[in-house]
Amino acid sequence: MPAARVEYIAPWWVVWLHSVPHLGLRLQRVDSTFSPGDETYQESLLFLGVLAAIGLGLNLIFLTVYLVCTCCCRRDHTVQTKQQESCCVTWTAVVAGLLCCAAVGVGFYGNSETNDGMHQLIYSLDNANHTFSGMDELVSANTQRMKVDLEQHLARLSEIIAARGDYIQTLKFMQQMAGNVVSQLSGLPVWREVTTQLTKLSHQTAYVEYYRWLSYLLLFILDLVICLVTCLGLARRSKCLLASMLCCGILTLILSWASLAADAAAAVGTSDFCMAPDIYILNNTGSQINSEVTRYYLHCSQSLISPFQQSLTTFQRSLTTMQIQVGGLLQFAVPLFPTAEKDLLGIQLLLNNSEISLHQLTAMLDCRGLHKDYLDALTGICYDGIEGLLFLGLFSLLAALAFSTLTCAGPRAWKYFINRDRDYDDIDDDDPFNPQARRIAAHNPTRGQLHSFCSYSSGLGSQCSLQPPSQTISNAPVSEYMNQAILFGGNPRYENVPLIGRGSPPPTYSPSMRPTYMSVADEHLRHYEFPS
């Protein structure tokens, strides 16, 4: 046996959780000894759930106050303020996403650790149950051999060798030895009730653990989906998606606090058991198994003497005595009574099988096998199980913090979306630099192309007369130039009216540029048609 398995030592987190003050619902101090049937002890575990409920209430109150203050606060939305709000919302979403991913990672580890611990507990319970069942089967089989099978052989031999009184005395002595074996076997504990309870406990533990593991797995997936979809709503500026996911985030926040309450109560209660498991087992098995036997299996120290040693020794001596008697009858009685050989060989085979069963029973009754299962069960529940519960509690706290952060970022993002839409609505639809107008123009093929100040129609006029006019400043109104633009085939909304209004002269060309300009104008005339 490995040295680490010789003695159970409670880990530090068990000692720390056991030292947590146990208070009832009326704030009275409660004994921390593990007693799940005691109402006051149940109230002390329920009080931990009440603390988690208070934390949830304070969290919701804080979020409500924050939402009200954010929605009612009016601020001047300058360009710098909008940039700051956008940056704040972005970084808040990033931090919340990182917290959510970290929480799910911690939760996966804690869920796996708890599941491993529970499976180790179930495996140890099944092994112990198999050992107890094997003990009962061996005791029952040996009792059957001694009381039924051996009696039948002895009865037939008594009829065969009835003429010899000394042989009859040998048979009676063997019958007495068989009675001693049955008496010693009846003194061994019957584990039937223990195996029934262990089977029930194993099945209940497996059932609860499966749905616990599955519930946390679904909660992890829900947290990730809500966090990712909320970040997607922020990125796409979808108010509907953001609002629905924030509502789901509040639900997940409630589930996180509820899981924290369950984890805290389970961790503290299990730590109370793991602090002194021997005492609890001794107090609850006294009516079924002798306390000396229970203590022998729980402690399994070299200083303890096996309570079954005397019974097993008597069993072994009785079998040895009967084998000697059968050997003498085979040697001396068979020559006189040949028909007795079959029954004597049957008794010899029966005694050999009983001796094999005795060795198996001795190995099963030894404390080392069951004590190892006991230590494995404690390791699974007190080390891996409680450690996983602590990580699950940390997951609940991180998830609550992450979704609280997302909920705080929601109203700011909502106001930012509304202000952005309002700024778009304030822009004139006829403004060519309006992004909405540009999108409409891009999807409307019937709308004419945008012409510059030097349009193709003005180029045609320049071809007819290339002499630069006198550079005079015109004081004509803007509408006159707009009408001129219409006559030349342009769009008055897209002409550079301020340039005309300043009285800027048209472009002039030197004699060297005239052939180049005329060739360009001819090429433009081939691609565009103008009204006559």
Swiss-Prot record:
Ubiquitinated by NEDD4L, leading to its proteasomal degradation. Ca(2+) binds at E113, D116. Keywords: Calcium, Cell membrane, Chloride, Chloride channel, Disulfide bond, Glycoprotein, Ion channel, Ion transport, Membrane, Phosphoprotein, Transmembrane, Transmembrane helix, Transport, Ubl conjugation. One of its GO terms (biological process) is L-glutamate transmembrane transport. A motif (PY-motif) lies at residues 506-509. The modification Phosphothreonine is found at T199. One of its GO terms (molecular function) is volume-sensitive chloride channel activity. The modification Phosphoserine is found at S504. A motif (RGD) lies at residues 164-166. The record marks R164 as: Essential for the formation of the channel-pore. Residues 1-44, 109-213, 262-385 are extracellular. InterPro entries: Tweety (IPR006990). Forms cis-homodimers in the presence of Ca(+2) and forms monomers and trans-dimers in the absence of Ca(2+). Interacts with NEDD4L. This is Protein tweety homolog 2. It comes from Mus musculus.
